[in-house]
Amino acid sequence: KNLKKADYSWWKNRLISASKYYDMYRIDHVLGFFRIWAIPYGECTAVLGHTEPFQPITKEELEELGFDKERIRWLSKPHVETRTIEEVNNFDYLGTHGLLHKIMDRIGDEELWLFKDSIKTDQDIWDCDIESYYVKEKLTQKWRDRMLVEVEGGYYPIWTYTKTTAWASLNNAEKALFSELLAKKNEKMDKLWEKQARTVLGELTKSTKMIACAEDLGANIECLPKVLGDLDIRSLCVVRWKRDWEKPAQPFVDFEDYP
């Protein structure tokens, strides 16, 4: 967004300088011009990140799938069982309660806890007044144990949502409905990514007469080949990566079909 405000001059000026010496240039990891992985500030890992731009899942959409307020909380807030922390705290039940009260709130009389609102990222867990490394490590693992992350305007699924406790608790019908919703969101995001790439790459390619080549190896998003073709950006064709990823066994593409 900041680069756009400056009319992408940071990139353009470098391409103009390079054009004095070269006839062709390579755009490394061109997929990042379509969408980039954004990580919440303060997170120590990329697990709770999302693509940017992205299409959020709204509360209303989750309610239409049959998830009420409490179940949406279950999907989006890490729930920690006392015994999970007790196991790394010498099986000290009362001592574990004392530690958890520092950064968590107990749900009624259940042996189940939610992080306090003051805990915004896993760095806050590492910085809290708990001495045990093992307790902190387990708490940060549980911090990432959620299907959804709440943001302004809705929620987004974490990349590993199918490995979470919340996902395992859903029945097959709920999993199917949620997967269908994500598929619809991905279709919309594909259009967002295409629009962004056409804007940014279009500005760069027309800034000089150099031939543009893109590093687009591996499995990519659906709109990528068309955008590169429309903007006359050459692809890198490496035999082991040039495959039909959508077909069974992902066969290699024949040399005659190379662009």
Region locations from a protein language model:
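Catalytic cores of glycan-processing enzymes that make or break glycosidic bonds
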Residues: 1-259
